[in-house]
């Protein structure tokens, strides 16, 4: 296909309407107006207060002008499962994609309002292609500006507003390949004089538990004194590296560049009786069970950080 033929096919869309008029699912109504003004923080009383509206010469409350487009939106279900419309925007979009204009950004939206909308008005909209520009060089890439005119009518067919809508359909610029960035580091633990011994032992792949030298009570997380007898004297014992899942959560959000989402944060009850917050690896999240036996493994997060993690005592499928 020559460039001239493609240009003719594009320009043939100028002046055409994009599909049939689309009627709003619901008439203008006060509940939706209330939702809108509360979300926007718009306290103008003429939108919800009949008395205030009549005091300004209006017959009743009115809808904010900014809601015009909202009254004809097709809704969630139709957006998730749209039905193709002959001669609609989908066909024009496909033709633009054929020319490599696969990316889009909205550039302008100009409204002209003919009258205010009141509860009971039922709005429809039809869109017409006004112009398709020659190819332009932009900061985003080479593209074309598509200008359409949307005409909004009430249930009597009278024009209540028009909207001139402009999009830039463009070919994304090819970016030069850059050197791969090193993987982000895991967040650094807050190490202090009370817990430094624990992280030093972890560097040596030893999982230790703090023990009161006076009453022999094990404790975790580490602390300066025994919560049972108050002694400041302590030593450590090395954990066997076995335990069970006491509780867990699956983290999906917020994403962090150091972690592969989703990941499992588990509270593991060690055989010795103390509990440790850690990661559970080697198992799909939906296969985890409370009470599941787990064994110690080690994660070399980076050269400066080695952490204990746990995996199922009986190997599991990770998929």
From Swiss-Prot:
Swiss-Prot/TrEMBL keywords: Bile acid catabolism, Lipid degradation, Lipid metabolism, Lyase, Steroid metabolism
Enzyme type, top EC level: lyase
Domain of life (superkingdom): Bacteria
MF (Gene Ontology): lyase activity
GO BP: bile acid catabolic process; lipid catabolic process
InterPro entries associated with the record: ChsH2_C, ChsH2_Znr, FAS1-like_DH_region, HotDog_dom_sf, NA-bd_OB-fold, Thioester_dehydratase-like
EC number of the protein: 4.2.1.-
Subunit structure: Heterodimer composed of ChsH1 and ChsH2. Two heterodimers combine to form a heterotetramer. The complex interacts with Ltp2 via the DUF35 C-terminal region of ChsH2.
Family: Belongs to the thioester dehydratase family.
Role this protein plays: Probably involved in bile acid degradation.
UniProt xrefs under PANTHER family: BLR3430 PROTEIN
Protein name, as recorded: Probable enoyl-CoA hydratase alpha subunit
Gene that encodes the chain: chsH2
